[in-house]
Amino acid sequence: MLPKMQPSAQCLIVFSLAFVLGWYVLRPGNTSCVLLITGESVRLVNCELTKDLVEAVLLRPLKHL
């Protein structure tokens, strides 16, 4: 069984894990592109602004439903 940990240590572990996962997803060498859709907006996250992407957005802008 695992020993009990202090709440501050648990908090540090959780924030460290979130930071590492966030860094992995948003690192410069990552080629994935994420479309984040919320009730307020539509965002492209971690995408390179290539000429093709800019032309696609200009030709067919994203609309709210």
Curated annotation (Swiss-Prot):
Cytoplasmic side, ranges: 27-65
Xref: Pfam families: TGBp3
Alphabetized InterPro entries for the sequence: TGBp3 (IPR003411)
Keyword presence, Transport: yes
Organism domain of life: Viruses
Keyword DNA damage: no
Lumenal side: 1-6
GO cellular component, one term: host cell endoplasmic reticulum membrane
Protein localization: Host endoplasmic reticulum membrane
Function, in words: Plays a role in viral cell-to-cell propagation, by facilitating genome transport to neighboring plant cells through plasmosdesmata. May induce the formation of granular vesicles derived from the Endoplasmic reticulum, which align on actin filaments.
Note: TGBp1, TGBp2 and TGBp3 seem to act together for cell-to-cell propagation. TGBp1 is the main movement protein that physically cross the plasmodesma with the viral genome. TGBp2 and TGBp3 would facilitate TGBp1 function.
Homology family: Belongs to the Tymovirales TGBp3 protein family.
Protein name: Movement protein TGBp3
Organism, scientific name: Potato virus S (strain Peruvian)
